[in-house]
């Protein structure tokens, strides 16, 4: 930790010293009068040199920041689509959705609220942690399976009424 602070201090000293030295050198730069064809001398550090010449066209000047901004925007969009389509991200999103549905079921939220949260019967089945073989079986005394069947019939009736 002490070495880190020493390194940080040394870097700040080196870069701070070079910036102070370059600022004094920059302030002393002068453009000769013969190059300017003007009766007065002016200091380079006092004025902006962008569009200093009347012959430059503002529309033709290249702006580097706009180009960098568009490149960064396309890079972030491609990164976002790549990360969103990656398998680990999708698995994490499915686990998060499953735990969210489990919490809703434990709270005893109504079927209407589950439907409004776009919970599908398959998500409901997974959240109840039922075995896939139970889905097709005729076990009637399993309360979780009965709850699933009730939600599935409710969901299908809502989908039919929404379609008409």
From Swiss-Prot:
Keyword Iron: no
Signal peptide: 1-20
GO cellular component: extracellular region; host cell nucleolus; host cell plasma membrane; membrane
Coiled-coil ranges (or none): none
Keyword Manganese: no
Record motif RxLR-dEER, residues: 48-63
Keywords in alphabetical order: Host cell membrane, Host membrane, Host nucleus, Membrane, Secreted, Signal, Virulence
Homology family: Belongs to the RxLR effector family.
Entry remark concerning the domains of this protein: The RxLR-dEER motif acts to carry the protein into the host cell cytoplasm through binding to cell surface phosphatidylinositol-3-phosphate.
Protein known as: RxLR effector protein PexRD49
Lineage of the organism: Eukaryota, Sar, Stramenopiles, Oomycota, Peronosporales
């Amino acid at each position: 930790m002490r070495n880190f602070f020493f390194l940080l201090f040394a870097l700040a000293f080196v870069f701070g010293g070079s910036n102070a030295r370059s600022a004094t050198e920059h302030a002393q730069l002068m453009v000769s009068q013969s190059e300017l064809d003007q009766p007065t001398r002016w200091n380079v550090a006092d004025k902006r040199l962008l569009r200093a010449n009347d012959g430059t066209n503002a529309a033709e000047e290249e702006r580097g920041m706009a180009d960098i901004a568009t490149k960064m925007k396309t890079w972030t969009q491609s990164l976002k689509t790549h990360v969103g389509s990656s398998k680990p991200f999708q698995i994490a999103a499915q686990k998060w959705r499953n735990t969210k549905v489990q919490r809703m079921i434990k709270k005893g939220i109504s079927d209407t609220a589950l439907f409004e949260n776009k919970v599908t019967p398959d998500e409901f089945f997974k959240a109840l942690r039922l075995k896939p073989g139970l889905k097709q079986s005729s076990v009637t005394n399993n309360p979780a399976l009965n709850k699933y069947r009730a939600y599935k019939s409710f969901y299908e009736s809502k989908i039919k009424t929404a379609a008409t």
